């Protein structure tokens, strides 16, 4: 009998072949391949299945779909998985332990899951601006999901911070409904897809603020403006607006495993071998939480498939 924390419930002592933490593209792909390989698996997800895909307006680089909304693609992935009838735990992982050859997963609904192996596919968290009152204005003028909250600001003035694909795609989406979109980027050059960037440049209601960062958030109960600072001459200017959408990068979600002393890269992402196994035997990482150069839907799916097929071969 495996011992667990006294305040957690153990409905049974089933030890799954693999527990998949996260139901984004990596976790869903691992689940589909795992079920088809006859593995007894559990999937743990406390948020909307689909990962960051469901927060994306339009996806135009996923094979088989010339253009599809992120929520629709995420739903199709999820339905494909659910049709295979995996065991699903709709909760968040708060801590992962290992006792001998068995992993113990503590969930925030006070249940516990046991597994021989784990695929950690938690994705990433949006990086915050790092300015005063950011948490205070969350939901009141600060949003990290344009497709979730953009319609609340129809015919209003909004800002998007960032210069990558996410920032440009969400600025395009917001420009279809907002009165004005202010695109704020800390440098001249962009890392975004040139086609999408050119579309944005040609829109009459988009204003570019290059070589600027957000220095201050203005307002009392709700956001009503921001102060920008020039990265070259440090001059400042104020913009009156109703909401800011930061898209300035992401951070790995490693708190549930931080006590395991896993190998991480300098940015805090999990280091794996080519089979997606971390420095702890039996613990695999897949998708955006893994240390790698490219983070795309396709690369996440690749990670999940490799991880679960490796597990199939070793169990």
From Swiss-Prot:
Disulfide bonds join 145-148. FAD binds at residues 45-52, 288-297. This is Thioredoxin reductase. The lineage of its organism: Bacteria, Bacillati, Mycoplasmatota, Mycoplasmoidales, Mycoplasmoidaceae. The keyword Flavoprotein applies. One of its GO terms (molecular function) is thioredoxin-disulfide reductase (NADPH) activity. Belongs to the class-II pyridine nucleotide-disulfide oxidoreductase family. Binds 1 FAD per subunit. Gene3D superfamilies: FAD/NAD(P)-binding domain (3.50.50.60). It is found in: Cytoplasm. SUPFAM superfamilies: FAD/NAD(P)-binding domain. Its EC number is 1.8.1.9. One of its GO terms (biological process) is removal of superoxide radicals. Homodimer. Its cofactor is FAD. It catalyses: [thioredoxin]-dithiol + NADP(+) = [thioredoxin]-disulfide + NADPH + H(+). The gene is trxB. Keywords: Cytoplasm, Disulfide bond, FAD, Flavoprotein, NADP, Oxidoreductase, Redox-active center.
């Amino acid at each position: 009998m495996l011992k667990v924390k006294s305040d957690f419930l153990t409905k049974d002592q089933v030890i799954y072949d693999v527990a998949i933490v996260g139901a984004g593209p990596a976790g869903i792909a691992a689940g589909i391949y795992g079920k088809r390989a006859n593995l007894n698996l559990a999937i743990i997800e406390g948020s909307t299945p689909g990962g960051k895909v469901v927060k994306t307006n339009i996806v135009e680089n996923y094979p088989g779909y010339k253009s599809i909304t992120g929520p629709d693609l995420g739903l199709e992935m999820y339905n494909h998985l659910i049709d295979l009838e995996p065991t699903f735990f709709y909760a968040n992982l708060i801590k992962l332990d290992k006792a001998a050859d068995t992993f113990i997963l503590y969930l925030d609904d006070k249940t516990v899951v046991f597994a021989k192996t784990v695929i950690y596919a938690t994705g990433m968290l949006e990086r915050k601006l790092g300015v005063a009152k950011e948490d205070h204005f969350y939901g009141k003028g600060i949003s990290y999901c344009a497709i979730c909250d953009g319609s609340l600001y129809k015919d209003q003035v909004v800002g998007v911070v960032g210069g990558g694909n996410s920032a440009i795609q969400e600025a395009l989406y917001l420009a279809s409904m907002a009165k004005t979109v202010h695109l704020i980027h800390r440098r001249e050059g962009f890392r975004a897809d040139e086609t999408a960037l050119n579309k944005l440049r040609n829109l009459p209601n988009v204003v570019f603020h290059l070589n600027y960062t957000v220095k201050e958030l203005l307002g009392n109960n709700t956001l009503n403006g921001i102060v920008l600072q020039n990265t070259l001459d440090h001059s400042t200017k104020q913009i009156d607006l109703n909401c800011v959408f930061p898209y300035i990068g992401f951070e790995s979600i490693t708190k549930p495993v931080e006590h395991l002393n896993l190998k991480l890269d300098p940015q805090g992402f999990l280091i794996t071998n080519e089979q997606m196994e971390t420095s702890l035997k039996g613990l695999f990482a897949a998708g955006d939480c893994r240390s790698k150069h490219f983070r795309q839907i396709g690369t996440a799916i690749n990670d999940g498939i490799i991880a679960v097929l490796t597990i199939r071969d070793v169990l």
